């Protein structure tokens, strides 16, 4: 499978490090084999879109720029020269040699660049970043040491202190993500329609309408099978694309030799200059077609996390780049000697008659593979947006148990399918779709260039001059291409702009509402002084059981707690405040994921657990969550007692109490139960009849029977692992034993989940725009997205939702 080995295989860094350390040639051979294997696999995942560009580049270039009247050998050579230098400058020089080096712990893409900037400077708009997050292993790149210069310090302060600049940065990132989603709408129609249009070369009776219906049928089938996952056929992706690329290269060589070997001269930029001298404004407008030769380039960086930079470089330099150059050169040789050919089908007309049908079949398969790669990338970008609080919650399904990155979102899938069919039937012509496609491609690359310039300054800590040179060298070229694409806004170029504006509006409104809700929680959180004044009973009735309260606060007590106890003065004997929090790193290691601490003195039995996840982590269903939580709290209690013993902290003073309640510790899942002081038994294990009878006589047996009835109808809840905890007799500290006993008793009594069901309203004094954004747009999105209880896999029978109105 294309991604299986890259996520579970040998780490290139480890191999190189080992090889460098002991000089063993075997390690280097393993490393090279690993790189070549990943390079082979990347052909099917990364380069499917880029490899299908020869189907429509020359057609779009000559039609968009009205170059048919200039179609002579020198102009054709000029078009090829533009394609060659475009492929050399942007995909090869910019992406392969520069951008791929800006990985975020091996991950790439627009959000990887933004994550790097947020971690190395305070550019985030979300106020929930804590100092403890900076202690994560993956937070800073190895060997990072801040180096401040007067210019860098001034630039950093300007961006950090001006909220509008940080908002502009976020909107830029969201715009780039929206354009990637737009690619997911435009790539399937463009690729499939272009491949099927070849049928009209040898079947003149086939009408354009029939080609469109055939293309829509294939697109519907493609989206219908998404829920099955691509892992069953993914092993065919790389062979299909490699055969297609080798075929492109061979056809290119054939056309060069047969039609016009003089096309080799067009590698010189001389023909590029002559092209603009002859064509003028028409030549500039035709850049919108040249732009299509780069479609799919961003995938090299976006899919970096599935492979390695070395493997992607090897695949591009060793196979993709030479095959594409040969194909474009061969088409130019054919065009230069065939001035009367139908430019709409130039690729298929350049194919020798004897192999036309095999090439058409492989072209169709390559188009489907390229479309699948973009669809999967769209699912991935939506997941990342959701993790960072920039997209409404949608359902994420894992289609493979072995490959973590294979995901599927039903809502996004059907939206993409409807949009793809609408584009195919609405625009109909690949030239119009190409105008839209080029706009999206140029926009994504320009966003990457802008973010990359900031990374060069703030992350790599090079001088601003180096960043300026990078920005000028690539940004100016991409801006020229974008300006040419903008000329075709009335002829299809409006589509990616409309799609991007819609998606950016959805993302920003959701992020704005989420941010204002968090600010309200921070401003209205319960004072610890109020908690202390209530005493150990908190002024309410403490009932048996564990109450798990979900909150977005990583510190303090949320207002939902005081709202609940004010209206219903009873709560569980053990309270655990849980904050599921996204941090700006791609992945958080399991042993660093949970921060555990306590709120108030020991006798209050109030704890806090912060669950941290990266923007590429998925919150999968954890059937052992409750048991893991108990074990982690027990581990924290033991760690705290050990620390107290070492530091000789007294427990009878106010100072000790304050110090205790301020502690937070990273607590991994205990591998040794003896460290927790608890014994864990499976149901029925060493359980006496007397114990079972005593348990049945307890009031919570009724609750247990209700749970059992619900489990028969809820397989997901029934899959939760049931165990019984016992306190070991090894404790010498009576406080620890008492606290663990209370924890175990509460766990056996049952667990309830409390979550806020908030209604966000704009204040009456707010502007009309803010009222519309909060009261209408955000409320609509929140009502129609998945609830947080479903996302967090909370059992419905144990969930209590507390309604609150937030005036922001």
Curated annotation (Swiss-Prot):
Belongs to the HAK/KUP transporter (TC 2.A.72.3) family. PANTHER family: OSMOTIC STRESS POTASSIUM TRANSPORTER, POTASSIUM TRANSPORTER 3-RELATED. High-affinity potassium transporter. Keywords: Ion transport, Membrane, Potassium, Potassium transport, Transmembrane, Transmembrane helix, Transport. It is a multi-pass membrane protein. Residues 1-34, 103-167, 226-232, 305-313, 376-406, 461-464, 513-808 are cytoplasmic. It is found in: Membrane. Residues 56-81, 189-204, 254-283, 335-354, 428-439, 486-491 are extracellular. The keyword Hydrolase does not apply. The keyword Magnesium does not apply. GO terms for cellular component: membrane. This is Probable potassium transporter 3. It comes from Oryza sativa subsp. japonica (Rice). InterPro entries: K+_transporter (IPR003855), K_trans_C (IPR053952), K_trans_N (IPR053951). GO terms for biological process: potassium ion transport. Pfam families: K_trans, K_trans_C.
